[in-house]
From Swiss-Prot:
This is Endodeoxyribonuclease toxin RalR. The lineage of its organism: Bacteria, Pseudomonadati, Pseudomonadota, Gammaproteobacteria, Enterobacterales. Pfam families: Lar_restr_allev. Induction: The sRNA antitoxin RalA probably works by inhibiting translation of the RalR mRNA. The ability of RalA to block the toxicity of RalR relies on a 16-nt sequence which is complementary to a section of the RalR coding region; in the presence of RalA sRNA decreased amounts of RalR protein accumulate with no significant changes in the level of RalR RNA. Its cofactor is Ca(2+); Mg(2+). Transmembrane segments: none annotated. The gene is ralR.
Amino acid sequence: MRYDNVKPCPFCGCPSVTVKAISGYYRAKCNGCESRTGYGGSEKEALERWNKRTTGNNNGGVHV
């Protein structure tokens, strides 16, 4: 399925994202490098997590 208003992957820049449901939980995954979010309770929550970006952390990395 194609999703509107989804940010490209922060790691590889791929614009293609898939949401997968496993046992009633959902996660978003990059179709390029396969980075993914943690699980959420809905497809909408998984996409919101995907689009949420932080400016950094103690390790200097980017969280999805």
